[in-house]
Regions:
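Compact beta-sheet-dominated domain cores in extracellular/mature segments
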Residues: 1-113, 120-128, 132, 136-156, ...
């Protein structure tokens, strides 16, 4: 595999039919014969693959920057991009601080970059909401937090993600557009927890 390409395979351990993709490819395999067919991948030295579940909007994602003999843990590959190795996926999860049961609230995040992701309160996983190359540009997403029982939206706003050159990580910048009844904290270089504090 060359430095700027990846090769997906239809069988584990790099077996079966191979399918090469290059840096910059933004692939949606939905409605094609290759949807959910890839089970292993070889990755060039200067790129990585960011893959995510697309049609059920979970935003569950994986990033692969080295060869992977088994990628089936993503639960079927439909959407992926081949990006420079320094690119970071941006991901969020929802934490409910109001005391409701697990999955009482959902947070839908709309992004021009990767589409829509939906995460639920109490869920352990992060949903992919964007991609940021080293040094930017910024990524803006719209967020909608909904009470799944009543259907009422309890928080709406936007998140403005920017590159922090000092820490080589992503940060949230737009306090004025972030919902007033929520807080956020960075868990890792690129993963954030959005906390719902109240619904009044």
């Amino acid at each position: 595999v060359s430095d700027n390409e990846v090769i997906f395979y239809e069988e584990l351990n790099y077996g079966g039919a191979s399918h090469p993709y290059k840096l910059g490819d933004d692939i949606n395999l939905g409605n094609t014969s290759l949807n959910d067919k890839f089970t292993s991948v070889k990755v060039g030295a200067k790129v990585k693959v960011v893959a995510w579940q697309h049609y059920d909007q979970t935003g569950v994602y994986r990033e692969w920057d080295v060869d992977q003999p088994d990628i089936t843990d993503i639960g079927g590959l439909t959407r992926f991009r081949v990006v420079k190795s320094g690119t970071l996926p941006i991901a969020v999860r929802l934490e409910d601080l109001t005391g409701q049961e697990k999955h009482h609230y959902s947070m839908k995040v709309d992004s021009h970059d990767v589409g829509t992701a939906k995460v639920y309160s109490g869920g352990a996983g992060y949903g992919l909401v964007g991609l940021m190359p080293e040094a930017g540009p910024p990524v803006t997403t719209a967020i909608y937090v909904r009470d799944e029982k009543s259907g009422v939206y309890v928080a709406t706003g936007s998140i403005y993600f920017t590159w922090d050159g000092e820490t080589k990580s992503i940060r949230i910048d737009n306090a004025e557009n972030f919902p007033k009844n929520m807080e956020h904290q960075r868990e890792r270089r690129n993963e954030f927890t959005c906390q719902l504090k109240s619904v009044s």
